[in-house]
């Protein structure tokens, strides 16, 4: 099996790998869709998201880079378990070990309210591209739209000078299931 490198991760646009697969008469067994924002031509936030940003600000939500991995992992595990009967691909120990090995490339950003982590995401930095994984909020965080404020900060401030912001894939079952809520 081979997974093609997404176009936005190439330093120079190229598809030699796809051509080699064609020559070998390879067949596709899966197809995923990635949601990527070109920050040199950003999309306008939907009105619902802009209202969410205002709601989070008026509630007193703050956003920051954080070392509160255990607090966020608790929010993430609860959310995945209750909504999907699933668990994170990485354990808390694994993700903190990866962060310790690559502190300039793997970061945690959290949204807090009254001193409690109510949401967050893990960010992977690689050249001109930023990719997020493990986007999650508690029930209270969802009520206060903490993720709208978090992504407003990440897209418009923290990573505005990067080229691409990759939200990851929105599929399951090798591409046969599309989670439209992630698009």
Task: Identify the meaning behind each predicted range.
Residues 1, 142-156:
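Conserved acetyl-CoA-binding loop-helix of GNAT-fold acetyltransferases
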Residues 1-7, 158-170:
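Conserved GNAT acetyl-CoA-binding A-motif
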Residues 5-142, 158:
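A conserved beta-strand-loop-helix scaffold within acyl/acetyltransferase catalytic domains
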Residues 15, 50, 148, 152, ...:
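Residue-level marker for well-ordered alpha-helical positions
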Residues 124-126, 158-165, 178-180:
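A structural signal for short secondary-structure junctions
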Residues 167-183:
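Conserved catalytic-core subdomain
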């Amino acid at each position: 099996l081979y997974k093609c490198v997404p176009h936005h991760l190439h330093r120079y646009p190229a598809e030699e790998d796809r051509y080699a697969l064609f020559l070998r008469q390879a067949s596709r067994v899966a197809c995923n869709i990635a949601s990527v924002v070109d920050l040199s031509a950003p999309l306008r936030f939907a009105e619902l998201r802009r209202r969410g940003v205002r709601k989070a600000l008026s509630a007193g939500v703050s956003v920051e880079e954080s070392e509160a991995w255990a607090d966020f992992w608790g929010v993430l595990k609860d959310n995945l378990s209750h909504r999907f009967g699933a668990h994170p691909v990485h354990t808390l120990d694994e993700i903190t070990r990866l962060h310790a090995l690559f502190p300039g490339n793997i970061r945690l950003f959290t949204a807090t309210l009254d001193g409690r982590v109510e949401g967050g995401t893990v960010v992977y930095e690689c050249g001109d591209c930023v990719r997020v994984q493990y986007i999650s909020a508690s029930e209270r965080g969802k009520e206060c739209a903490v993720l709208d404020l978090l992504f407003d900060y990440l897209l418009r401030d923290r990573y505005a000078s990067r080229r691409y912001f990759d939200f990851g894939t929105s599929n399951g079952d090798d591409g046969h299931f599309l989670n439209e809520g992630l698009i």
